[in-house]
Amino acid sequence: MLFHPIYDEDLAQGSYLIGCQATGEAIAVDARRDADTFIRAAEHHGLRITAVTETHIHADYQSGSRELAERTGATLYLSDEGDADWKYGFEGVKLYHGSEIKVGNIRLTAVHTPGHTPEHLSFLVTDGATTENPGFFLTGDFVFVGDVGRPDLLDEAAGFVDTRFDGAKRLFASLRDHFLTLPDYVQVWPGHGAGSACGKALGAVPSTTVGYERVTSWWAPLVAAGDEESFVTSLLEGQPDAPLYFARMKRTNKAGPALLGERPALRRFEPSELQGRVNDDLILLDTRDAERHRADHVPGALFVPEGKKFATYGSFAIDPDADERPIVVLASSEAQAEWMRDRLSWTGIDNVIGFVTSLEGLTAGPVPTVAPAALDSVAEAQLLDVRNANEHRAGHLPGAMQLDVSRVAYRSEQVPADRPVVVHCQAGGRAAVAAAVLRAKGWDDVRELEGSFDAWVAAGNEPERADDAPEPAAAGA
C-alpha cells in the first residue's frame, strides 16, 4: 500500500493519495482543485486514480473532487448521510455508514461521524494484502491533532441558527462511539493542521494516533467520563472568527463546484493599459510585500501579498459573489501569475484574466500611516483591530472596534466612513490587507498604525484586556 499525504500550508489542509501497488490503482481523498498535483503524484508512483472521495462538504476551500474525477475518469463517491439540507447537488456514488470503497487490495470503510457537519464521513483504511484490521483513519474535520472540528460553522458562516449545540452533542457521540472504540495503534490523519479556522487548537504535526489522543487531548477525559455538558461548553468556548467566505464555499461545494477544465492563457497587460481602470472595470491585485506596497500604492488596488497565505488572504479581500470584475495580478512572470490564478481558484476566485509585471507609470503614492506616538493627534479616529476576537480580548487598544480581517470585505458597513479609520493588527500584515479593502470600497481616510499592536505596546502603552481573556498570544502578523 502507498500512503501519500499532500499537504498545503496556505490553507493548512491535508489531502491523501492512497494506492494499491499490486494493481496500480489509487484513490484521492479531499482533493483541492489543482488536479494536476494529484495526477502527477499518482503517475510518479506508477498509479492511476480510479476513485475520488471526500469527507464532507468543505467550508474553507473549493473542493476539487469533481474536477479530479472528471479529469481522470475516476468514480466519484459522496456522502449521502445527514439531513436534506446537506445533500450533494451533483452525481456520485452514494456512501453511508459502513459503505466500502475498494481500490485493488485497499479497503476504505465509511464511518458516519457527524458533529462538524451533519453529512461528515471519516474513512478507516485497511491494507487487505497484509491484514484485515484497519491501520489508518482519515478523519477530515472530525478529529485533528489535539483538537476536534468546530460544530458552529453552519451558524457562523452558512446562515443557520443554533445548530452548534446539536452539532457539539453529535460530535460527542461520534467521538464516544466511533473514535475511542478504535485500537490505540490506529494512525489518525486529519484534514487540517495548525493555522486552520476549522478548529481552535490544532496541532502543528501532521498526524497522531487514537492512543495518543486518548491520553493527551483535552476532550478525551470528558468523553470517557460521559460529561457531555462540559464537553459542549469547552468546545464552543473561544472558537476563532469564522471567515465569511466559508458561506460561499459551503454553498458551491454542495451544489457542485464549476469545472475549470483547460484554462485560457493569461493576458499580459502594460501598466498604461490599467491607467483609469483600476477599481473601475477591473481589480488590480498588488502582490508585493507590505513594505513595497506601503511605499508605492496604486489607489483602488487590493493588497494580497504573494506568499504562503496567498489563497487565504485572497479570499479575505475578494468576494466574487459581490464583485464579478476581472482581476489582473502583479507578477514577476507569466508562470508566477499562473501560480496566483491557480491559488485563488482554490477558494473559488476564478476571474483572473491577466497580469502586469510593473506598476511603472501608474498613479501611485505612499500609504497613509500614523506612528503610535502620534495616534492621539488623529482627531475622532476610529481604531479598527482586524485581529481575531480572541486576540482582541487578550489585549487591545482602548476604544478599538474589532472586525477580523477575513470579514472586512463582507462587513465593511460596520466601519464608520465619516471619520478617519486607523487600522492595526498584531504586527501589520493583516492590517495592510484590510486597509486596502476599505480604500477600494471608498473610505476616504484610512491609515495604518505603524508597527501595529506590537509597536504600540513596545512604546509603553497599556492595552485593555477582557476580564476572562486568556494570556496574550505571542507576537505575530
What are these regions (language model features)?
Residues 1-48, 69, 123-140, 145-146:
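Conserved beta-strand hairpin/beta-sheet module of binuclear metal-dependent hydrolase folds
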Residues 18, 30, 56, 68, ...:
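Divalent metal-coordination and catalytic microenvironments
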Residues 23-24, 36, 40, 44, 50-59, 107, 117-239, 424, ...:
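Metallo-beta-lactamase
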Residues 31-32, 57, 81-82, 117, ...:
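Active-site metal-binding loops of divalent metal-dependent hydrolases
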Residues 50-53, 75-81, 329-330, 355:
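Short internal beta-strands
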Residues 88-89, 150-152, 164-165, 212-258, ...:
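Rhodanese-like catalytic fold shared by cysteine-dependent sulfurtransferases
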